[in-house]
């Protein structure tokens, strides 16, 4: 792979998970790994045959706990006799030894004992992140910005830099995680004068609160506080204990000593916890958990909040401490930024918001990606990316939801995709659905769902006075234009007459709040699979209807009068009418039924059309390879490919 000199990546090297991003084509891309995950476990495992990094390592931890290393970030840059190392050692299933005052991890690899420095373990994770980026970019990458907690001392920073070097990276800079998060939100741009930012970072294994002041692009850390042992894993532990007790009650058996059962339960608990951030209840189904007993149960969000109540409430203490240390009143904080996957928990957000008297929280960037996002921006700036996008990137806003209009069948046709930087302008050509249709109704929606009924209607207007023409002939040009203030102008123009109409939608009227946007985006993810099926179903229905209409009009064509026998013509027309009336009665049929009907119709029509073609027919139906085109179902307008 040839290296691309001008490209640099940003890496968030986390205690439990890591994340990598790159700035290209005017925006930051957070890069998914080979498993399709945008965050990668900071785990390295050694077996008799191989070394595993990331998801593969974490997935086998139950079978191989002594040789699966994680939490290297808790060791890096520390001495063996450091109290932190001594207390953490008691909790790890792997062995840590003392070599000349430095800690090393002892594992069995390919049948022999091997000791690794924390820098080496971290470098393996960094290598994985580097390879993830290279697979995405298609060329090798050496330049990187790596993030560390604000409280890391010089030796921890240097050790992290060394880990980068071991991984074959040229570390452009080590930057603080809270600074990266602030850069991601562009908080260093825009306002003149000093800004105070509180970064609330609740990750998988650690909790950090930082207060930064940003003045003219200069970042200063005023205070840090937190708990190096509070995070998502602690919430998982509470769930595990709860279910171990439940299993005891239901089945009179204690599973807590069975490592594999506990590990499987923990994995299910982590999944349930994530579900509870978007749903009020989660189900656990674990087959043959212990002694052949299936464990099927559920937990509500309220119960989860009760189990972790003291931990959640405890997150406010470091917030108060950091404000005291910074000698700052909470009213003086301009921005509150959420970082770390655990800040998705609604109760955590509510406690923080209530503490700051209902202030808005910055959470539009995925909280587990915000640090890598900022690191990627910083990397581009350090590489001298002079594009206006980098210089102004942090001034630019984005469209929080996709914007589009309703086309035939109630389908949402998107013109401006979610997270497009604004200002932006997109144009697409649409057409009429019925013959001699005098006008079209343009209905503007925002949302991520495939069907407009599930999205939010922003406004509608009519474009009238379209000259009579067959369906599909008029060309209606629709333009969506969002200016820098987020104001949307939608214009529709009939290209034949130049007649146009427009609507202006300002962002305060009928737009969704940040919370609703968050909720819709989460819902959309959940529904994406359903939507895909729905989209395929409508495409199949459209294809069938289109084929039937086109065959009908083709055999009714004056030019074909003498070329086709009345019986063939009747056969086609009858079959088309039968299909169209079946369609009327079966709007909600499955994709397979629509496809089956279309094949049936094609099998009947194709021999007749072929016969026509062989008899020297001319006209649209008779062009070689003719297949009636795709049209749409339903009311108003139809998309032209």
From Swiss-Prot:
Instruction: Enumerate the SUPFAM superfamilies for this protein.
Output: Actin-like ATPase domain, Heat shock protein 70kD (HSP70), C-terminal subdomain, Heat shock protein 70kD (HSP70), peptide-binding domain
Substrate-binding domain (SBD), as annotated region: 396-511
Cell division as a keyword?
no
User: Alphabetically, which GO biological process terms does the record hold?
Assistant: binding of sperm to zona pellucida; chaperone cofactor-dependent protein refolding; positive regulation of protein targeting to mitochondrion; protein refolding
Gene3D superfamilies, per the entry: 1.20.1270.10, 3.30.30.30, 3.30.420.40, Actin, Chain A, domain 4, Substrate Binding Domain Of DNAk, Chain A, domain 1
Q: Give positions of region: Nucleotide-binding domain (NBD).
A: 3-388
Disulfide bond: present as a keyword of the record?
A: no
> Which annotated residues bind ATP?
14-17, 73, 204-206, 270-277, 341-344
Q: Which GO terms describe its cellular component?
A: cell body; COP9 signalosome; cytoplasm; cytosol; mitochondrial matrix; mitochondrion; nucleus; plasma membrane
The UniProt induction remark is: By heat shock.
Q: Name one GO molecular function term.
A: ubiquitin protein ligase binding
Which InterPro entries does the annotation name?
ATPase_NBD, Heat_shock_70_CS, HSP70_C_sf, HSP70_peptide-bd_sf, Hsp_70_fam
PROSITE patterns recorded for this chain?
Answer: HSP70_1, HSP70_2, HSP70_3
Short name of any one Pfam family annotated for the protein: HSP70
Arranged from A to Z, the UniProt key words for this protein are: ATP-binding, Chaperone, Nucleotide-binding, Stress response
Instruction: State what this protein does.
Output: Molecular chaperone implicated in a wide variety of cellular processes, including protection of the proteome from stress, folding and transport of newly synthesized polypeptides, activation of proteolysis of misfolded proteins and the formation and dissociation of protein complexes. Plays a pivotal role in the protein quality control system, ensuring the correct folding of proteins, the re-folding of misfolded proteins and controlling the targeting of proteins for subsequent degradation. This is achieved through cycles of ATP binding, ATP hydrolysis and ADP release, mediated by co-chaperones.
Q: How does it assemble?
A: Interacts with PRKN.
Which family, according to UniProt? Belongs to the heat shock protein 70 family.
The protein's name in its UniProt record: Heat shock 70 kDa protein 1-like
């Amino acid at each position: 792979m040839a290296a691309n000199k001008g490209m640099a990546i940003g890496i968030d090297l986390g205690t439990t998970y890591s994340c990598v991003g790159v700035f290209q084509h005017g925006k930051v891309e957070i890069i998914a790994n080979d498993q399709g995950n945008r965050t990668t476990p900071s785990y390295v495992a050694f077996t008799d045959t191989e070394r595993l990094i990331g998801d593969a390592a974490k997935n086998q931890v139950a079978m191989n706990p002594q040789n699966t290393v994680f939490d290297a970030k808790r060791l890096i840059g520390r001495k063996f006799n450091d109290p932190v190392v001594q207390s953490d050692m008691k909790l790890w299933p792997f062995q840590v030894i003392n070599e000349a005052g430095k800690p090393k991890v002892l594992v069995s690899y390919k049948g022999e004992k091997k000791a690794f420095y924390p820098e080496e373990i971290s470098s393996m994770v960094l290598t994985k992140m580097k390879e993830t980026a290279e697979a995405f970019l298609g060329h090798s990458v050496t330049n990187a910005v790596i993030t560390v907690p604000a409280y890391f001392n010089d030796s921890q920073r240097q050790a992290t830099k060394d880990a980068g070097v071991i991984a074959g990276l040229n570390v452009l800079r080590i930057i603080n995680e809270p600074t990266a998060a602030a850069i991601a939100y562009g908080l260093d741009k825009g306002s003149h004068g000093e800004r105070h930012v509180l970064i609330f970072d609740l990750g998988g294994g650690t909790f950090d609160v930082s207060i930064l002041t940003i003045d003219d692009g200069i970042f200063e850390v005023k205070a840090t506080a937190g708990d190096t042992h509070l995070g998502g894993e602690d919430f998982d532990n509470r769930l595990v204990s709860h279910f171990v007790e439940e299993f005891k009650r239901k089945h009179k058996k204690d599973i807590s000593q069975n490592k594999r059962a506990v590990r499987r339960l923990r994995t299910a608990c982590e999944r349930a916890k994530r579900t509870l951030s978007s749903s009020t209840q989660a189900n656990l189904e674990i087959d043959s958990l212990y002694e052949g007993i299936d464990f099927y149960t559920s937990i509500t969000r309220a119960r989860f909040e009760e189990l972790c109540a003291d931990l959640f409430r405890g997150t406010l203490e470091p917030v108060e401490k950091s404000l005291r240390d910074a000698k700052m009143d909470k009213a003086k904080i301009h921005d509150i930024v959420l970082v770390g996957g655990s800040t998705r928990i609604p109760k955590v957000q509510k406690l923080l918001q209530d503490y700051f008297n209902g202030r808005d929280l910055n959470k539009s960037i995925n909280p587990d990606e915000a640090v890598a996002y900022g690191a990627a921006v910083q990397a581009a700036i350090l590489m001298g990316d002079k594009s206006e996008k980098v210089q102004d990137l942090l001034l630019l806003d984005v469209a929080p939801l996709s914007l589009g209009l309703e086309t035939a069948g109630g389908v949402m046709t998107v013109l401006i995709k979610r997270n497009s930087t604004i200002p932006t302008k997109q144009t697409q050509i649409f057409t009429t659905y019925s013959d001699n249709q005098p006008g079209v109704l343009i209905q503007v929606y925002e949302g991520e769902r495939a069907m407009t009924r599930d999205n939010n209607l922003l406004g509608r207007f009519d474009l009238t006075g379209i000259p009579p023409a067959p369906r599909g002939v008029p060309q209606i040009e629709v333009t969506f234009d969002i200016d820098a203030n987020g104001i949307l102008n939608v214009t529709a123009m009939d290209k034949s007459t130049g007649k146009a109409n427009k609507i202006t939608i300002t962002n305060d009227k009928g737009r969704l709040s940040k919370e609703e946007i968050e909720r819709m985006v989460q819902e959309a993810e959940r529904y994406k699979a359903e939507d895909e099926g729905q989209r395929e179903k409508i495409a199949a229905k459209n294809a069938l209807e289109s084929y039937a209409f086109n065959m009908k009009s083709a055999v009714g064509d004056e030019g074909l009068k003498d070329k086709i026998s009345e019986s063939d013509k009747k056969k086609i027309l009858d079959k088309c009418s039968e299909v169209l009336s079946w369609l009327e009665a079966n709007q909600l049929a499955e994709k397979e039924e629509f496809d089956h009907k279309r094949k049936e119709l094609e099998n009947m029509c194709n021999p007749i059309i072929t016969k026509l073609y062989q008899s020297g027919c001319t006209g649209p139906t008779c062009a070689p390879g003719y297949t009636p085109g795709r049209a749409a179902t339903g009311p108003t307008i139809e998309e032209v490919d």
